[in-house]
C-alpha cells in the first residue's frame, strides 16, 4: 500500500503510547524516525537506523518498507515520536502537505543556510520546488528566482514567493540569473533531479555559493570541473531528504497557524479512495492545472 502524507484520527493506541487519546486528530510525517538511534539523536531523522546506528533513507517507511497511508487504516511505527496533534483551528487540508512536500521543500532552504538578504534561484516549480521557494522567502531571501516553463506553476511560484520566474524555453537561464543577481546567486536549489538542472544550478552560483539538492537522481550525476571552479571555488553542495518526527510537524503547523505560509493553493484536486485510479491518472498527466491531489477514505 502506497502513500506517505497522512492526516487521520486515532482509532487505537498501542502499548506505551502516552499523551494521546482515541479521537485525536493527528498529522504524521512522511519520514517516521524512531527518535532513539544515532541518526535521530543527531537530527538526521530521514537516515534513521531503527534503534541504533544509521541507515541511508531508513526513516522512509510508509509505502516503502511498510504499508502506506492510502487506505482506511494506517499503523504508525514509533508512534510516540511521530504523532503530532493538529490544532483545532487548522483543517486537514491546511496540514496534509506538511507531511512531505512542505517539510522537504523547506529543508532545501534550511540546508542551504539561506541568510537574510541572500539571492536564491529555485530550479523546477513542482510541489516541492514551490515549497522550497516559500521556504527561501520565510528564511529572509531578498530576491528569489524561479525556473519553470509550465504556465500554471509559473503563476503559482509568483504567488508563493518568487520575485521573477524564468521560462527555460524562452531564455538562457544561466545568463539571465547572472544578469539579475549581478554575477550569480548565493543559493541555488535543485528540485527536479536531472543532470541538466544540477549543472545549471552550479553555473548560476557566485563563487562561494551553495547548491542545495532536493532532486532524486536516477542515473549518473557528473560535476563539470569548470562549473565547480576545478574544486577550488569555495562552492558547497548539500543534499537533504524530508525531515520527520512530531516536533518537525509541530513547527510546520505553527508556521501555517501564524499565517506565514498557506499550503492550501497547492492542493488543487480532491478524490475519494474509490476514485484513486482517476486521481493518479490526473496527477500523472498533469491536466487541469493539477499540483497535488488529496485522497479521503
Name the predicted role of every residue range.
Residues 1-41, 46, 66-67, 87-89:
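Glycine-rich beta-strand-centered segment in the early N-terminal region that forms part
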Residues 14, 31, 170, 192-193, ...:
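Short glycine-/small-residue-rich Rossmann-like dinucleotide-binding loops
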Residues 26, 83-171, 175-176, 187:
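Mid-domain Rossmann-like dinucleotide-binding core that forms the NAD(H)/NADP(H) cofactor-binding site
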Residues 34-123:
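NAD(P)H dinucleotide-binding glycine-rich loop of Rossmann-like/cofactor-binding domains
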Residues 171, 179, 183, 187, ...:
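C-terminal hydrophobic helical "lid"/dimerization subdomain
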Amino acid at each position: 500500500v502506497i502513500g506517505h502524507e497522512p492526516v487521520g484520527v486515532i482509532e487505537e493506541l498501542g502499548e506505551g503510547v502516552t499523551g494521546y487519546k482515541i479521537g485525536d486528530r493527528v498529522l504524521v510525517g512522511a519520514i517516521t524516525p524512531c527518535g532513539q538511534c544515532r541518526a535521530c539523536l543527531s537530527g538526521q531523522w530521514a537516515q534513521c537506523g531503527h534503534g541504533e546506528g544509521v541507515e541511508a533513507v531508513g526513516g522512509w517507511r510508509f509505502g516503502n518498507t511498510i504499508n502506506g497511508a492510502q487506505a482506511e487504516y494506517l499503523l504508525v511505527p514509533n508512534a510516540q515520536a511521530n504523532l503530532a496533534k493538529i490544532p483545532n483551528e487548522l483543517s486537514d487540508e491546511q496540514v496534509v502537505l506538511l507531511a512531505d512536500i512542505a517539510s522537504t521543500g523547506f529543508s532545501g532552504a534550511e540546508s542551504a543556510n539561506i541568510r537574510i538578504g541572500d539571492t536564491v534561484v529555485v530550479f523546477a516549480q513542482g510541489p516541492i520546488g514551490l515549497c522550497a521557494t516559500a521556504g527561501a522567502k520565510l528564511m529572509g531571501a531578498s530576491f528569489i528566482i524561479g525556473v519553470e516553463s509550465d504556465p500554471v506553476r509559473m503563476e503559482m511560484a509568483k504567488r508563493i514567493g518568487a520575485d521573477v520566474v524564468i521560462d527555460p524555453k524562452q531564455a538562457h537561464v544561466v545568463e539571465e540569473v547572472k544578469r539579475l543577481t549581478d554575477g550569480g546567486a548565493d543559493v541555488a536549489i535543485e528540485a527536479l533531479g536531472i543532470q541538466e538542472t544540477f549543472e545549471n544550478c552550479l553555473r548560476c552560483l557566485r563563487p562561494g555559493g551553495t547548491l542545495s539538492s532536493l532532486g532524486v537522481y536516477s542515473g549518473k550525476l557528473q560535476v563539470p570541473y569548470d562549473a565547480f571552479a576545478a574544486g577550488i571555488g569555495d562552492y558547497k553542495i548539500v543534499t537533504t531528504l524530508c525531515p520527520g518526527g512530531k516536533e518537525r510537524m509541530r513547527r510546520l503547523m505553527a508556521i501555517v497557524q501564524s499565517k506565514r505560509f498557506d499550503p492550501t493553493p497547492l492542493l488543487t484536486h480532491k478524490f475519494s479512495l474509490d476514485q484513486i485510479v482517476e486521481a493518479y491518472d490526473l496527477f500523472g498527466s498533469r491536466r487541469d492545472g493539477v499540483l497535488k491531489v488529496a485522497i479521503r477514505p
